[in-house]
Amino acid sequence: MKIHTSLAGIGIVMAGMALAAAPALGQDIAGAATTGAETACELHVFPTLEGQAQTTSLLSGFGIVGAIADAAANKDRNISETDYLKEALGPKFQIAALGTIDLVSELKLPAGTTVTFEAPIEDRKISTKEKARLTPSAAPCYAELLVTQTLYQKKAIYGRSLNNRFIFKDFRTGKTETNMVKGRGGNGLSHFPPKTTDETEAAEADLLEAFTKNFLEYSASI
């Protein structure tokens, strides 16, 4: 699996991923020698800038009035946790998490598929509704994976969790537009959000682990 990135605009350092991908890159080079000039399949991955936090109490169980009171009571907390979530699970962390997964295998793409991490798309209407390709590539074997949501929730009964939404677009049929395979994954959190600065590292590791599990839940369903 070859890994590329076009995220220079947001300054992502991919050194660790490059080291991890080295054996696979060697395999790709060796494979190319035996398969000739065969065109590799392409997977383009788009992380998201979307981040939301939602804290609710037992008030939400008392209809609209309770939900309104609950939202008002937790407004400041939700804003601060959303800001932290956007920073802690921003594009470079999403890429780090996805870099630990064999995306080609999980998405059932051909061996030797090149993986390119693209810059996030700010317009949600494009990322969630556009059925055409989001890059200029005209490769006949082409697919896209988009992360479209990171949602942190804290509920009075169920506790804390991270939920993510993904979209997979497979253009291998030769169509200019394709179906958007949408889905989600959700897993519990133990350390996020951190209560002190000493807990920041554990909280961010908690988020990354949950994000990875969420993707594997999604990929298993497609």
Task: Label every PLM stretch briefly.
Residues 1-11:
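Bacterial N-terminal signal peptides that target proteins for export
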Residues 15, 21-23:
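N-terminal signal peptide c-region/cleavage motif recognized by signal peptidases
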Residues 79-88, 172-221:
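Short secondary-structure boundary motifs at beta->alpha junctions and helix caps
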Residues 88-146:
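Short, solvent-exposed, polar/charged sequence segments at loop or secondary-structure edges
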Residues 110-115, 168-176:
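Structural alpha-beta junctions
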